[in-house]
Structure formats: structure tokens, C-alpha cells
Amino acid sequence: METQEPKDSSPPTEQRILSEELISEGKWVKFEKTTYMDPTGKTRTWETVKLTTRKGKSADAVSVIPVLQRTLHHECIVLVKQFRPPMGGYCLEFPAGLIEDGESPEAAALRELEEETGYKGDIAECSPAVCMDPGLSNCTTHVVTVTINGDDAGNVRPKPKPGDGEFVEVISLPKNDLLTRLDALGAEDRLTVDARVYAYALALKHANAKPFEVPFLKF
């Protein structure tokens, strides 16, 4: 990124944005050159990608963690596999999508879950807005955990309702063996596991692992 030495050697109290210049804009995203001040007083530039759809919403999107619960079955995490042109291959992801105008994060999560998987669920919890790839864009999402009653008649044979141009395969994996299953699937050619899914699986593994023992100090 470009830098410019400050005229005043006194460092600013905090880093801040000085200007944002639009370089290119499409239907869904725009590309900007962001000029900002660093802690030493230098002016720097950053190449930034932004969505065009936020318009005052609490976040751009929702990412859904769907927990499928059925009698006499292990809990499963419902994922979606779809082709992602920027990756040039398939990705295994949580159901997700943009929040529509006037829509709450919870409503968006339930809508996206039903559209992409066919399942209907209940909200367990909703996170505050969290960033997705802050080194590249300002995109934010709510992470929404949804429980699915797999014994409900409407969830026995769910039928996805994909939008135009959406081609999604639903994959349910056991929660207690999620990381192992992801590693096996990730070894397939042209399939990449989304970082949010993998981080969730790692967290499950660490949470269920033997607690770390405090080492004895040697004097």
C-alpha cells in the first residue's frame, strides 16, 4: 500500500479514515481506495471491497449454525455445498445470505435456512454483528444458532427453495465427529471448507478435549 510521510511529526491519538475514493462499482460490490492515518502519523492507502446492500442495517448478512435434533440420533450440523466462482470450485459452508430491507437478523436466518435446506427451525441465539474478512472488506454478519426438530413432519423430508442461480447440496454431519468428517470431505478435489465451519469444528473439539493441566514450575 502507498504511504506518505506526515508533515507534522506528532503522532495522532488514534488511527482514522481520511477519505474513501470509489474505483469501481457493480450490482453487489464496490471497490474503493481508502486513505487513512496510522499511529505514527503516516498517511496510507488500502484497497477495500464493500457490499452495496447494507443501507443502515445492523449487518450485511447472517450465517446460520443449524443443529438438527432427532430422537435416537446424534445431533447433526446442517451444511450446504455449492460452487463458488471466485474459488473455482465447491465450498462447504453454513447456510447464509444477505439481510433484506426491514428484516431482522433472526427472520433472515430462518428464511435463509428454509430456502437453502428446506428445514424450519427455532432461534437459539443470535450474535452481535461480527466482521468476516476485515483485511479485505467491511462486510459483517450475525451468527445465528438455530435448532431443528427433526421429528417434526415438515422436517422429515425437507425440500429446499433455492433462488434463481442457486444450486445447493445439503450435507448433514454428526456434531460429535464434525472435524474428522470435514477433514475427509476437504481432501476431495475442488472442495474447500469455509473457515467459519472449520473454526466451529475446532472449537467443538477443544471444548470436548481433556482440560489443560497446569504445569508444575521447576526452580
From Swiss-Prot:
It catalyses: D-ribose 5-phosphate + ATP + H(+) = ADP-D-ribose + diphosphate; ADP-D-ribose + H2O = D-ribose 5-phosphate + AMP + 2 H(+); 8-oxo-dGDP + H2O = 8-oxo-dGMP + phosphate + H(+). Its EC number is 3.6.1.13, 3.6.1.58, 2.7.7.96. Mg(2+) 1 binds at residues 96, 116. PROSITE patterns: NUDIX, NUDIX_BOX. Mg(2+) 3 binds at residues 112, 116, 166. The modification Phosphothreonine is found at residue 45. The keyword Cell membrane does not apply. Its cofactor is Mg(2+). Pfam families: NUDIX (PF00293). One of its GO terms (molecular function) is snoRNA binding. Homodimer. Interacts with PARG. PANTHER family: ADP-SUGAR PYROPHOSPHATASE (PTHR11839:SF1), UDP/ADP-SUGAR PYROPHOSPHATASE (PTHR11839). This is ADP-sugar pyrophosphatase. The lineage of its organism: Eukaryota, Metazoa, Chordata, Craniata, Vertebrata.
